[in-house]
UniProtKB/Swiss-Prot annotation:
Pfam families: TrbC. The lineage of its organism: Bacteria, Pseudomonadati, Pseudomonadota, Alphaproteobacteria, Hyphomicrobiales. Interacts with host plant RTNLB1 protein. The chain crosses the membrane at residues 65-85, 94-114. This is Protein virB2. The gene is virB2.
Length: 121
């Protein structure tokens, strides 16, 4: 119990502002370097304008093409491989199989279902 009282007295001697100054002084060199680097290496932003250039439908089509293309097929293959490895090591679970198969069905079936419901080509 005496040990706790000694630490409590030690903590009472440090005020909050004193503790903050210790933290700030220990971090000052790295903060100063980071600020100097960000000021010296700043330049104009290379962003597109928000008002024009790309139609939202085009952006959605680009995302669908990306997901349904080779990237999505690779994800589907990796999911099936994960199911096979889990079955090989005896960690099979119906939840894992249902989640992966359901995700594949949703990923590849959503485009077809959307086109069917909207009458798109």
């Amino acid at each position: 119990m005496r040990c706790f009282e000694r630490y409590r007295l030690h903590l009472n001697r440090l005020s909050l502002s004193n503790a903050m100054m210790r933290v700030i002084s220990s971090c000052a060199p790295s903060l100063g370097g980071a600020m100097a680097w960000s000021i010296s290496s700043c330049g104009p932003a290379a962003a597109q304008s928000a008002g024009g250039g790309t139609d939202p439908a085009t952006m959605v089509n680009n995302i669908c093409t990306f997901i349904l293309g080779p990237f999505g097929q690779s994800l589907a293959v990796l999911g099936i491989v994960a199911i096979g490895i889990s079955w090989m090591f005896g960690r099979r679970s119906l939840g894992l199989v249902a989640g992966v198969v359901g995700g594949i069905v949703i990923m590849f079936g959503a485009s077809f279902l959307g086109q069917t419901l909207t009458g798109g080509s």
